[in-house]
Amino acid sequence: MSLRTKVIAALTGATMLGGAITGVIQHNEGLSLTAYKDSAGIPTICYGETKGVKMGQRASLSDCQKQLIQSAGEHAKALDGLPMQLSDVALLGALDFTYNVGVAGFSGSKVKADLKRLDYAAAAKSVLAWRYISKYQQKSPGTGWVYKGSNRWTFDCSQYINGQRNKVCWGLWERRQWQSKAIGNQYKNVNAAVSALTKYGG
């Protein structure tokens, strides 16, 4: 049995882990029945779905719930290669992280490399490095953006602007903090991990 099989079984079998997976993604992504552009300018719908999404697109709640289970199962393929001993809490955090950064992003990350060694502390630290968003345009998108060359601008989502939490992507930073604790196996169980979401804005 692989971790991907475990996730799919949890999602389709309505288990505690399956409920936690969908609950975390729903909380962290939020729900939109109409397509919108996320903080990086990518068309998004339902619970953070970006694949094949076009502006103007609409979906029903039922469509979004089905899509979430299917998409979470597809994202679970990024867990291939991780040890079966990976805790459910770390698995929950890793799947939410993958849902946000994509299968390729997680698969090539230091986070996954750390989890392969079951080095939860290192993985927790590695997650926090994923706090930047990028935009490609000639002029600065605004305060706090840093030019990286070739019309690429980056924004550190953990930064304060004029003493206030930034309004660009602070929610992403809060999500990374929760993911860091989950991937770091710092919650007692999946229920405690889900309950901890209320501390963060999501």
State the predicted function of each range.
Residues S2-L11, A20-A40, V53, R58-A72, ...:
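Long, amphipathic alpha-helical surface segments
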Residues T34, P43-I45, M84, F97, ...:
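Flexible, active-site-adjacent loop/turn segments at secondary-structure boundaries
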Residues S39-I42, L91:
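A structure-centric signal for secondary-structure junctions around beta-strands
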Residues T44-C46, G93-D96, A122-S126:
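Structural recognition of the beta-strand scaffold that forms the well-ordered cores
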Residues G48-T50:
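Solvent-exposed coil/turn segments that connect beta secondary-structure elements
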Residues E74-K112:
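Active-site nucleophile-His-acid catalytic modules used for acyl/amide transfer and hydrolysis
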